[in-house]
Design a protein with these regions (language model features):
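Conserved helicase NTPase catalytic core signature
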Residues: 105-311, 320-324
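Conserved helicase motor core of SF1/SF2 NTP-dependent helicases
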Residues: 15, 20, 29-73, 241-242, ...
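Non-catalytic alpha-helical coupling and interface elements of nucleotide-dependent molecular machines
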Residues: 11-14, 40, 44-47, 83, ...
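Walker A/P-loop NTP-binding motif
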Residues: 3-15
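Conserved P-loop NTPase-based nucleic-acid remodeling module centered on helicase motor cores
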Residues: 43-110, 117-118, 137-138
Length: 368
């Protein structure tokens, strides 16, 4: 049924789906391998096939937690627990932090950090994105303290030096360590490993949302293998964190380097042929760059956790937990789904015994 529905969607809504594709989710890789063989033979290449344990790129989980742990991890209460856990990593120091800037001593105060944190949180952006605002706001306050101390020490400086002073602070080891301790960027995996390995952090994040027994069930070694239930939590954490801006900056730098390399290559090619009036070096470089990304739509979508699909087909859907449904709904905000399964046959303690129970948290806006 799932295979036929995917083929039907691709054929009937080809125009709408050619740039977004279809995601097929099934519990076993064996069934998905069959789909991967059949659909290309029908000329369909815009399909991504994933098990629930593969929803987050870079993570592949194929084992389940025990029933009690799976029930806790699959509960929507985890959204509140994880949100509290992320906010707890935006810390105000208990006391002032002394900083040495080329022999000039200044202080980062709890008040400075609290004000910078408030500015960052007010943006409403995910943790890693809001960190940019936090760092800027904290540095603005440190520059003022730095200037005041330079003035007190009667060291020469001018207003036009402020950008250089800001650079000195931004690159200073003490400053970087202090700001990282207050608001460190994380990947979903590094955050989850440290969070679930810490009883103290679990207790703080739990609040009134999960019980003491459930906290004990969630606690795990830092090097534990990912489970299928973890994948939905990693997806939620990724939403709360956002991309690491430092990693994004590295990608931008890499892209600029590649662009320069393409341009240099194009200029060399054009210098060897008579191309006047035909194509510019920049145009040729753009063509080279376009050719280098020869991935199919399915390959691009599978590598992008934030990809929005035109349609999602879910096989054995009764096995999915509320948190896994939340992860899937995120990948199709229009809620264009084909759901294949039987609630009476669920074998998962966190699965659905009725479709109303499984889907009502996500379909309130569609109620008639």
């Amino acid at each position: 049924v799932a295979l036929h529905r995917a083929a039907y969607q691709l054929y009937t809504h080809r125009k709408r789906l050619e740039h977004s594709g279809v995601l097929i989710v099934a519990p076993t890789r064996g069934f998905l391998r069959y789909i991967e063989r059949v659909l290309p033979s029908l000329g369909e290449t815009g399909v991504v096939t994933l098990t629930p344990g593969e929803l987050v790129p870079g993570v592949r989980a194929d084992t389940h937690d025990c029933e009690d742990v799976a029930r806790v991890k699959g509960s929507l209460a985890m959204t509140k627990v994880l949100r509290r856990a992320v906010k707890a990593r935006q810390q105000v120091p208990k006391g002032p932090i002394d900083l040495n800037i080329d022999g000039v001593h200044i202080t980062l105060t709890p008040g400075d950090v609290r004000a910078a944190r408030a500015e960052a949180r007010a943006t409403g952006r995910p943790h890693n994105h809001a960190r940019t605002t936090f760092v800027r706001a904290a540095l603005d306050r440190l520059v003022k303290a730095y200037v005041a101390e330079l003035t007190r020490l009667e060291r020469p400086w001018a207003e036009e030096d402020r950008a250089d002073l800001l650079h000195d602070l931004r690159t200073n080891h003490d400053v970087k360590v202090a700001l990282n301790r207050c608001w460190l960027p994380y990947s979903p995996q590094s955050f989850a490993r440290s969070f679930f390995a810490s009883t103290e952090r679990l207790v703080h994040a739990a609040g009134e949302h999960i019980s003491t027994r459930e906290i004990t069930l969630l606690h795990r070694p830092k090097d534990a293998e990912w489970t299928i239930e973890d994948v939905a939590l990693l997806d939620e954490i990724a939403e709360l964190l956002g991309d690491d801006d430092t990693a994004a900056q590295r990608e931008q730098d890499k892209a600029r380097t590649t662009e320069r390399s393409n341009l240099e290559y194009a200029e060399k090619v054009l210098s060897m042929i008579d191309s006047e009036g035909i194509v510019s070096a920049a145009e040729l470089a753009a063509q080279v760059g376009a050719r280098r990304d020869s991935r199919t739509l399915a390959e691009k979508a599978a590598a992008d956790r934030t990809w929005t699909y035109g349609h999602i087909v879910v096989d054995e859907a009764q096995e999915l937990s509320p948190m896994m449904w939340r992860a899937l709904m995120r990948r199709n905000p229009t809620k264009s789904f084909t759901i294949v399964g039987d609630g009476a046959q669920t074998s998962s303690i966190s699965g659905a015994d009725s479709w109303d129970h499984a889907l009502s948290p996500f379909l309130e806006d569609r109620a008639s």
